[in-house]
Amino acid sequence: MGRYSVEPDNATKSCKARGSNLRVHFKNTRETAQAIKRMSLRRAQRYLKNVIAKKEIVPFRRFNGGVGRKAQAKAWGCTQGRWPKKSAEFLWQLLRNAESNADYKGLDVDRLVIDHIQVNRAPKMRRRTYRAHGRINPYMSSPCHVEVILSEKEQVVAAPTPDEDAPKKKQSKKKMARQKLMQRD
């Protein structure tokens, strides 16, 4: 069992999942993970399915050199985006694993939110490609480690409505005297 970089605030109301040395591009996976951070579990799964079907886009904000401009990215407040299919599939599988962990712990799956998701670089894997004039160049892959923590969202309690029974705001003697003078006039 590997270590997580962050421990959840309430361990009984959260679940974890992680993947190590995943053969999927680090940069694409990082941008996809940033897009689903703080989403509910159901919304994130639906979003990743839409990315695979090219109905929703992943905004590329940090690793955006050479990334084309797309109209769908306007929904995210940026101009550049892509549909990283393999990254979306890997993250979807990881969310499914976290969901089954939550189900095993007896958590309410419909109230789960992605509290923490992190993508780290893994050791590069080396291959070679053959070039002209007998040269050989490296042909590296950029795998990654991914960890996700889902937490149950707390029930939102409505704020109390202001009633007539509520205590009135205190006023200074000076202010009360001024109001009495204003009422006489």
From Swiss-Prot:
Q: Which UniProt keywords apply?
A: Ribonucleoprotein, Ribosomal protein
Start and end residues of each stretch annotated as Disordered: 157-185
Instruction: Write down the InterPro entries for this protein, in alphabetical order.
Output: Ribosomal_uL22, Ribosomal_uL22_CS, Ribosomal_uL22_euk/arc, Ribosomal_uL22_sf
**NCBIfam families, A to Z:** PRK04223.1, uL22_arch_euk
What CDD domains does its record include?
Ribosomal_L22 (cd00336)
Q: Which Pfam families match?
A: Ribosomal_L22
Q: Does the keyword DNA-binding apply?
A: no
User: This protein is called what?
Assistant: Large ribosomal subunit protein uL22
Q: Which family does it belong to?
A: Belongs to the universal ribosomal protein uL22 family.
What organism is the protein native to? Argas monolakensis
Gene3D superfamilies the record matches:
Ribosomal protein L22/L17
**MF (Gene Ontology):** structural constituent of ribosome
Instruction: Please name the taxonomic classification of the source.
Output: Eukaryota, Metazoa, Ecdysozoa, Arthropoda, Chelicerata
GO BP annotation list: cytoplasmic translation
Q: Name one GO cellular component term.
A: cytosolic large ribosomal subunit
Q: Where is the composition biased (Basic residues)?
A: 169-178
